[in-house]
Amino acid sequence: MNKYLEYPEVESKELPPQKLVVLLHGVGSDGHDLIGLVPYIKNDLPNCHFISPHGIEDYDMMPYGRQWFSLRDRSPHIIAKLIANNISKLEDIIREKQTELNLTNKDTVIIGFSQGTIIGLYLTLIQQKPLFCTIGFSGALIPPMKVNNKLTPICLIHGELDQVINVSEMYNASNYLSKLNIEHSGHKLTSLAHSIDGRGLEIAINFINTCHNIV
């Protein structure tokens, strides 16, 4: 087992699991953060196994926390290069768990928050085989050089008061996805800053439960 494969997870209520949900945290946090959402959603997603990997790097601007890529230089082309260099490590984590659970991309849901949304959307767009669906909270889209996957439905959720990543990034992402004819939806939540609330979780649950496998 490689060093990235130790992280919190929650088994599905119904066995064997039919879906793998991968929770991707924001910068400076770790997998223990988003796994805390599972008690609020698992009853509505009884056939889902949840994992919440830790970012693959130590957070480089504080003496604690993890990151998926550095934010010391926030130029989009630099971020895209850093993600491209690191994405295979996240894919390894997901593939390992898929193999263990006898699941594949078509059974896999990506849920990201903030930086987790950025890498989650990138991951989604480069897949050779489509994922079941992807949900991004309070994030942005940094597109890859080449888009391989235009079939995974995407749900974007963003607080209108977000001062960390402006809600305009949701609209930028939506415009990009529209140009590629990628099925997606966007939800601006009133009176919400850089956070996930009950409204967003309800949207996410409904999205997962209404998506259908892509053959």
Swiss-Prot record:
EC number: 3.1.-.-
Listed Pfam families: Abhydrolase_2
Keywords from the named record: Hydrolase
GO molecular function: hydrolase activity
Domain of life: Bacteria
Stretch forming the signal peptide: none
Gene3D superfamilies to which the protein is assigned, alphabetical: alpha/beta hydrolase (3.40.50.1820)
Catalytic-site annotation from UniProt: S114 (charge relay system), D162 (charge relay system), H194 (charge relay system)
Assigned protein family: Belongs to the AB hydrolase superfamily. AB hydrolase 2 family.
Matches recorded under PANTHER family: LYSOPHOSPHOLIPASE-LIKE PROTEIN 1, LYSOPHOSPHOLIPASE-RELATED
Protein's name according to its UniProt entry: Uncharacterized hydrolase RP744
Organism: Rickettsia prowazekii (strain Madrid E)
